[in-house]
Swiss-Prot record:
EC number: 5.2.1.8
Top-tier EC class: isomerase
Any one Gene Ontology cellular component term annotated for this protein: cytoplasm
Gene3D superfamilies tied to this protein: 3.10.50.40, Trigger factor ribosome-binding domain (3.30.70.1050), Trigger factor, C-terminal domain (1.10.3120.10)
The entry's keywords: Cell cycle, Cell division, Chaperone, Cytoplasm, Isomerase, Rotamase
Catalytic activity: [protein]-peptidylproline (omega=180) = [protein]-peptidylproline (omega=0)
Function: Involved in protein export. Acts as a chaperone by maintaining the newly synthesized protein in an open conformation. Functions as a peptidyl-prolyl cis-trans isomerase.
Domain PPIase FKBP-type: 176-259
SUPFAM superfamilies assigned: Triger factor/SurA peptide-binding domain-like (SSF109998), Trigger factor ribosome-binding domain (SSF102735)
Designated name of the protein: Trigger factor
Domain notes: Consists of 3 domains; the N-terminus binds the ribosome, the middle domain has PPIase activity, while the C-terminus has intrinsic chaperone activity on its own.
Species annotation: Chlamydia trachomatis serovar D (strain ATCC VR-885 / DSM 19411 / UW-3/Cx)
Amino acid sequence: MSSRDFSNDLFSINIEENAGCVVSAKVQANPLVTQKCHKEALKTVKKNVVLPGFRKGKAPDNIVESRYSTQMEQELRRLFLRASFEALSQMCDRKPLSPKAVRSSAIDTCNPVNGGSVSFLYEAFPVIPSLPWEQLSLPDPEPVKEISEEDLENGLKNVAYFFATKTPVTRPSQEGDFISLSLYVSKRGDENSTPVAIFENKYFKISEEDMTDSFKARFLNVSTGHRVEEEIGSEDIQSFLNGDLLTFTVNAVIEISSPEMDDEKARQLQAESLEDLKKKLRIQLENQAKEAQHQKRFSDAEDALAQLIDFDLPESLLQEREELLSREKLLNARLVKYCSDSELEEQKQALLEEAKADARKAVKLLFLTQKVFSEKGLSISREELQYMMDVCSRERFGGYPPKDISNEMIQELVLVARDRLTYRKAIEAISSEKKDLEVVPS
């Protein structure tokens, strides 16, 4: 724990710093501050009262203070608390993460004549030391994957699905079929429990590439209408889903028959011939390979930056991200990888440790990328910001955002878009040549 002081003509602040970026602060204000707050409080209360013989807002100050002492006290304390928080945010180098990061605030004293004091307990922005760029360990870029004839043939098979005949069948499902599944969760034995859809009419291909072995075994050789009920033994999953019974329903078994690609079909896809389609497909696959290489380089840069330096992180952000990732990993294991309850229990500790490590990495990168963005002098253009806002808007509202979108929502979209661009640009700077990362310490 360390203690430090900050002061100006109006305020004096003492802070004590604790682990988890938790800071306790004592803000002392001189009488000029409380006098100003008292004057503003009086003005606010006067505007809202009407006394016999006086126009609204024109009653004498002493009468208003006498008759509306409770309202005056409440407004004075509100204004004084706000002024103290603003002083804390502006004067102290351990600023609160946000108003929501304040765990508690208490007005110890507040008097127009004698001044006042407020005690705060809050989470602050972390202190990040200078980044030791010379220690950055970033592997050399991997070569772009070459597109093989097998890759091209597999690509053509996927294109052929566009022309495939999709026939619902009554026979049991076979390897290579598609099945339409719905999954509901409910509370076993509860007559008032209404099943809740986890997904409906979702299509799965019965194959080793697209299904885990246990999931595939459940839905191979089953017919339309087949139902699988499965009790959830894991208390974690029960809590996440608010239920203990999973019900899978096979809505349809669909046989796929894909034709051989030829010149005629290629022309329907805006190609001159089958050979021309192959050339275009190769270009598409090469572009995908380049993007995969870029994503791998991006991921390597994230790892390198996260490992570059350690520092204390905000406790609540870390806990919030860890809880989110733990939930995702456990649900993914149970509902996507289709682990049994016993398999999930065996994997649980490893998954939770993985979530803890991933959470720490994510929160570290949140703050490190902001530091890199600042140190490197990076910038965001209006066009980039507008594009990213459009992306965020589509994610939030779909293709048609509401016409009466509020200013508050617009500000939220701006902040989210700016955060994403800041993160991306900082990581892309890391993924460039190491020699380009040398910066003058601020």
